[in-house]
Amino acid sequence: MTPSLTPGRERWLLLTLAGVQFTNIVDFMIMMPLGPQLTQVFGLTAAQFGLLVSSYNLAAGLSGFLAAFYIDRFDRRRLLLALYALFGLATLACGLAPTFASLMAARVAAGVFGGVLGTLVQTIVGDVVPFERRGRAMAVVMTAFSVATVAGVPAGLFLAAHWNWHVPFVALFGVCVGLLWGAWMVLPAMNEHLHTHAGSAWGRVKDVVTQPDHWRAFGFSVLLMVAGFVVIPYITLYTTSFHKVGEGGLSLEQVPTIYLAGGLATLFTARFIGRWVDHAGKVPVFRRMALVTTVPLMLMTQVAPLGIWFILPVSTLFFVCMSGRMIPGMAILTSTCEPRLRGTFMALNGSVQALAMGMAAWAGGLLITQDAQGRVLNYGYNAALAVCASLLAIWMVGQLRLVDAQHKTAGGPVRMVD
């Protein structure tokens, strides 16, 4: 555990981490609503676009696995600054890419660095913030998703609509430069974990992967990701495809509206859900949110022909529920490993999550089809798979063990049941 921070210093740390996550999320999320432009510019099929989206996650999965061998061997501050600088350069490369192949290569590079960044941010929260406040802390960091959907993605789409798809990535690089300077000023040295490590990196990986509890946590992560990313990457393609043939849907100019509304809603609900998690318990809140999420999952894949005034409330509820289940979900995962192995565990978990996201996005592209007029069909199959994953996650969470709870009980780690 790093030395205790004052409330003010902890707040600035969490806001800085949220800023890093903001750029990471925008870099990933902006690809999905840019789908109609990218498929037109490069002549891509839905499956090829799915591969472009999933390339980021597959690269992040591989780099996350490799990070497990070094993430606990460096000061967290220095590692985050180095990775963030490289991530910014990869984002700039996306903006300068002239061809599909070069864009694919740049997305892979962004995934290599961005995937480890996400893991590192979660690890720092787990190291710095005490267990009893971790739900609220995770909610602060996860407001990055809300701000990304409220400001980042709509701003990126505005730039793309008024110039071209390259401009959002170049602008995001500029934001990264500013945040890198801020992180260098704000982040404290975080090296206490270096004094608790015994043995080699291989030994720590072995300690993580030989514990059945950790494999259950990895399985839980897979279900979390599949439940979202078999559907999310294709929302824009699906809704705009019906508008093109005059059957409701969304125009390209209306797409930012659903991100703006969804982001504003989650901006207000995330803090409430974080407090609810700390008060009512991580597992009960997760189960309730995961069950409720199945409703907008199914509706989101059927609502396009009804037009924006039906799509907007459904998509807003969708964003709120997806964000709401991730707050307790990530708080649970950061608490399933002892502190000395948390960096290694979270690196491996980040790898598992990224691979699951990539495979889910790729599988989602294979499930949907397009008719002769370009309408996206069979999207309901994606929702059915997502609902199954959500229901399995509700069961799986009860099989996990909350290691940090040993500080609150006399009997060691406890199984996470109601």
Predicted regions and their residues:
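Cytoplasmic helix-loop-helix junction between adjacent transmembrane helices
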Residues: A106-F145
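C-terminal transmembrane helical hairpin of 12-TM major facilitator-type secondary transporters
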Residues: V283-P328
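Conserved MFS/SLC helix-loop-helix module at the cytosolic interface between two early adjacent transmembrane helices
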Residues: L62-P98
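C-terminal membrane-cytosol helix-exit motif in multi-pass small-molecule transporters
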Residues: F173-H193, M396-L400
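Extracytoplasmic gate region of multi-pass secondary transporters
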Residues: M31-M32, H214-Y259
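Juxtamembrane intracellular "pre-TM" segments in multi-pass secondary transporters
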Residues: T2-P7, A189-G219
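Helix-loop-helix hairpin linking two adjacent transmembrane segments in secondary transporters
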Residues: V140-W184
